[in-house]
Amino acid sequence: MAQTLYDKLWDAHVVHQESDGTCMLYIDRHLLHEVTSPQAFEGLALAGRQPWRVGANLAVADHNVPTLNRAQGIEDPISRLQVDTLDDNCAKYGITEFRMNDLRQGIVHVIGPEQGATLPGMTVVCGDSHTSTHGALGALAFGIGTSEVEHVLATQTLLMKKAKSMQINVEGELPFGCTAKDVVLHIIGIIGTAGGTGHAIEFSGSTIRGLSVEGRMTVCNMAIEAGARSGMVAVDDKTIDYFRGRPFAPVGVLWDQAVGYWRTLHSDAGARFDRVINVDARDIKPQVTWGTSPEMVLPVDGRVPDPDREKDDVRRSGMERALEYMGLKPNTPLVDIRVDRVFIGSCTNSRIEDLRAAAVVARGKRVAANVRQAMVVPGSGLVKQQAEREGLDKIFIEAGFEWREPGCSMCLAMNADRLEPGERCASTSNRNFEGRQGQGGRTHLVSPAMAAAAAVAGHFVDVRSFR
């Protein structure tokens, strides 16, 4: 019987299935960070248990770490306590951790693939919703809650029911000036933030195959913003080449065996999905969100929508609230919206290709006078090192951008990098909810190139014609 990629990954990890469909699923890789792990470790200790498989765990502090003056430590006492607690728990149980000043430290969803700790065919979980990122590598990856973190530590399994399957097929050559971020924002604009609810999404088609592995990670990262718990892409030669020489990747005969298995990780011809969405890449343009949800998104050459034209009462009310929070007026051209801050980073867009794309735009230019701060935050110490080797840091610094240490940074207001009330930010992150980047902060989601262009122009511009 023909199987989808999701079917194959799921079936390979079912340990036991109950009559109601509840399955015990084996977990291959468990990624830990400082925010959702303390209570899980505490529960483990109170029950007198040890981690079932220590080597399956990999930890890193990312949410709370400072991106400036790191040698001075963490100023906020709660943030410092969470990081110290992770350090202590990993030392206690012998779990590998990349500590704050380790070159390998970074955002958990960047360092997992970077190290080869995430591999095709794995089940990968983390106490973070954007774990879906790892599905770009042909893995079944999803976020879990703190109680589930404890359960995985103790048993290396989870109890759950299989989701429905959805295929989002994107065909055609990606237009000039458009990136993986524009692809996924365009998709969310079509299906909405609830479109994938209850489904595991496989992204497929010639456009997806044409993306780099890092671009595919950007797409799968935001599967959760489309309502799905997990997103995935079939394995191909790009995937396999990505893992050659990674520290945690198999070597020798084991590599050959692994590659043989990895090449089976695709949906079979004739496999049936519960829902199929077809997207024409020719319709994609550089995207900008205008509201307080990722589905409130438009092409950069569009205008802020007018709620009076919306017939649905609930949607109209949501639009009115979003416009009030964002301080925008209906029918305003998106290119007329000025920005106060620019953030290039996050688990969505902080990899080396993202920084290269932003640097191409920033080269030889200057951040606009009305932009109070433009910051670039690499996704890991190794990404930062590579960028500096290529001279990208100098391009950004000479243009007036701040060059920071790796971490989650301004993606969320859990560290020193945050917006002040009323500040408007062009951000390469994944969520534009009210207060996401700081109380009263106004977030517009864009690609790295679009963010860099906004920093230089002082307002949103169409990167396709920006000079």
UniProtKB/Swiss-Prot annotation:
CDD domains: IPMI. Belongs to the aconitase/IPM isomerase family. LeuC type 1 subfamily. It holds the Pfam family Aconitase. Keywords: 4Fe-4S, Amino-acid biosynthesis, Branched-chain amino acid biosynthesis, Iron, Iron-sulfur, Leucine biosynthesis, Lyase, Metal-binding. Heterodimer of LeuC and LeuD. InterPro entries: 3-IsopropMal_deHydase_lsu (IPR004430), Acnase/IPM_dHydase_lsu_aba_1/3 (IPR015931), Acoase/IPM_deHydtase_lsu_aba (IPR001030), Aconitase_4Fe-4S_BS (IPR018136), Aconitase_4Fe-4S_dom (IPR036008), IPM_dehydratase_rel_enz (IPR050067), IPMI_cat (IPR033941). Catalyzes the isomerization between 2-isopropylmalate and 3-isopropylmalate, via the formation of 2-isopropylmaleate. This is 3-isopropylmalate dehydratase large subunit. The gene is leuC. GO terms for biological process: L-leucine biosynthetic process. Its EC number is 4.2.1.33. [4Fe-4S] cluster binds at C347, C408, C411. The keyword Lyase applies. One of its GO terms (molecular function) is 4 iron, 4 sulfur cluster binding. It is an enzyme of class 4 (lyase). Its cofactor is [4Fe-4S] cluster.
